[in-house]
UniProtKB/Swiss-Prot annotation:
It comes from the Bacteria. It is an enzyme of class 2 (transferase). Keywords: ATP-binding, Cytoplasm, Kinase, Nucleotide-binding, Pyrimidine biosynthesis, Transferase. One of its GO terms (biological process) is UDP biosynthetic process. Homohexamer. Its EC number is 2.7.4.22. Inhibited by UTP. Pathway: Pyrimidine metabolism; CTP biosynthesis via de novo pathway; UDP from UMP (UMPK route): step 1/1. Catalyzes the reversible phosphorylation of UMP to UDP. UMP binds at G53, D73, S134, G135, N136, P137, F138, F139, T140, T141. SUPFAM superfamilies: Carbamate kinase-like. It comes from Thermosynechococcus vestitus (strain NIES-2133 / IAM M-273 / BP-1). This is Uridylate kinase.
Length: 242
């Protein structure tokens, strides 16, 4: 099947990069993700990525342990750059041209985030990985994904996680939890569903950017989502709740 979208933003959780490890980065998992992303690029789809840092450091946990919240968030932003560089290396080993742009200047290892330059890279067929979050504390990488998607005019956000969609309750603690096939932004917000944080969902709603939540643990899911195959959960303004 041919791709349904021309330009996409993929949100990868940091935890997904751990694989079965308790901490850090599993190189085999990164290589697997890179292979799937390469397939998307080879299909001619312009691909941007926002990666989290929770496999290395999570600002909220640091703050809960007594750290200054802003300081903890900045450390978390640096963790996302480590993940971005790791993914860049894996992609370039597969001959996929990739650029890392960071919201905090790190000129020795990455370009600064410049919207027009990012779009130009995408138009030239390069993958762009956005690191360091939005550059501001108190904002999640989910919100960064929504922000960058709006800025680069992405048609959809793919949120690839360890869960196969959005449920009406935590499936780990509620065996009878029901997975949604589709739902609206408003329903996700009013019922506090675990799609993204509320700021990110509101930003997607305001800019009419659909979100597809699916599991990365099934090989080929990124491409399936790209072709419009019904996997995971679709969140959008005109979606039926089902």
């Amino acid at each position: 099947m041919s791709p349904k979208y021309r330009r996409v933003l993929l949100k990868l959780s940091g935890e997904a990069l751990m694989g079965n490890l308790n901490y850090g980065i599993d190189p085999k998992v990164v290589q697997s993700f890179a292979s799937e992303i390469a397939q998307v690029v080879q299909a001619g789809v312009q691909t941007a990525i926002v990666v989290g840092g929770g496999n290395i450091f999570r600002g909220m946990k640091g703050a809960a342990a007594g750290m200054d919240r802003a300081t903890a968030d900045y450390i978390g932003m640096i963790a996302t750059v480590m993940n971005a560089m790791t993914l860049q290396d894996a992609l370039e080993q597969m001959n996929v041209p990739t650029r890392v742009q960071t919201a905090i200047a790190m000129q020795e290892v990455a370009e600064p985030y410049i919207r027009r330059r990012a779009i130009r890279h995408l138009e030239k067929g390069r993958v762009v990985i956005f690191g360091a979050g939005s550059g501001n504390p108190f904002f999640t990488t989910d919100t960064t994904a929504a922000l960058r998607a709006a800025e680069i005019d992405a048609e959809v956000i793919f949120k690839a996680t360890k869960v196969d969609g959005v449920y009406d309750a935590d499936p780990h603690t509620h065996p009878n939890a029901r997975r949604y096939r589709s739902l609206t932004y408003t329903h996700a917000l009013t019922h506090n569903l675990a799609v993204m944080d509320s700021t990110a969902i509101a930003l997607c709603k305001d800019n009419d950017i659909p979100i597809i939540v699916f599991s990365l643990e099934t090989a080929g899911n990124i491409y399936r989502a790209l072709t419009g195959e019904p996997i995971g959960t679709m969140v959008g303004g005109s979606c039926e709740i089902s």
